[in-house]
Amino acid sequence: MKRILLSAVLMSFAVAASAQNYYVDAQNPDMLRFGDYREPVRKEIVLPCQVGGYNVYKSDLHTHTIYSDGSVTPQFRIKEAWLEGLDVVAVTEHIEYRPFEKEFGEYVHANLKKDRDLNEAVRLSQKEGAYWDIFIIPGTEITRDGTTVGHFNALFTKDNNKVYDEDPVQAIRNAKAQGALVMHNHPGWWRTSIDFTEAEKVAYAEGLIDGVEVMNYNEFYPGIIDRVQERGLFIAANTDIHASSAEDFNKYEYMRPMTLILATERTEAGLRDALEAGRTLAYGFNTLCGNEALLVDFFKASVNVKKLSDKAYMLTNETEVPYLIQFGDSNPVHLSPFSTIRLEGTPEFKVLNMFCGKNTHPVVKLSF
């Protein structure tokens, strides 16, 4: 009897709790609305707000939509970026490869000029970006055979219709003539190494390349870190996204790679200045890559240090970046996101999930 009574009480609580998930619609009393409905909510990526006196902007410098070979609209792509915590998105549709135009229908082909306006995706993205407060970098991707030539993103283009040339290097020159910055994309894709193709040799020799992707989608090229350091280029990590991020990343619990831009302001002038100065970090796979000084500054901006005694101290990680630190040749120590660890000894260590070279890690020296 007691069990039956208890079950009835629990059931009544469950019904009451369930009922609280609904509310009567303000205009239609015959309609109940599910109470847990929410407006779109942005997932904030918790990183240092400033590093070395510069603001940290989370960006994706390589994206695609149905205006080339992506499977979503520009509007969807920009809203998606806002929901996932980004601040800056580059619109980089392929110039040469736009298969989805065939799917736009007979009406479109009959009523629009044959020569497509290759700036349309940028305009649509800028309009959507204004709504969601996402800064849009106009751009395009110069796309040729990945094994024998390579792919390059032109950023801050003025007119994408004037970039194409049959000669891929001349196409890069055309973009540079507009004031664009050129990023070498996924330098090992479809290849057996990251060695230069003949076209890439010419582009690099002429100083046409401003940055290189060290991470693209699920690819990581540690050797590129040395290249950007030696040549004074900016380093990047991007999605090269074609489908939705839910399909490409969230479903598999992959981290969306991003380029962290350290700039004075989120304007064209501010972002360009940062890229030209190489003030970027590549962030993906719980790994950070870039210049050693920038990495050290980023770590120090992420972690609060509390002195306990002459030998003991605590480190509190105030970001969502996990850190793996190593004192000398000892076993690594995990400093998980939003956690504190107690340590003793000399406050000098390597951060193993930070790379300032193919096989090198930054050394952090703390003072307190």
What kind of feature is each model-predicted range?
Residues 12-13, 72, 103, 250:
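Alpha-helical transmembrane segments and their juxtamembrane interfaces
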Residues 20-59, 78, 149-157, 192-368:
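Charged catalytic cores and adjacent phosphate/nucleic-acid-binding surfaces used
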Residues 4-13:
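Sec-dependent N-terminal signal peptides
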Residues 23, 32-181, 185, 207, ...:
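A metal-dependent hydrolase metal-coordination microenvironment
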Residues 140-144, 188-191, 241-242:
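Short glycine-enriched loops at secondary-structure junctions
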Residues 181, 187, 196-198:
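His/acidic metal-ligating clusters that form di-metal
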Residues 15-19:
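Sec/Tat signal peptide C-region and signal peptidase I cleavage site
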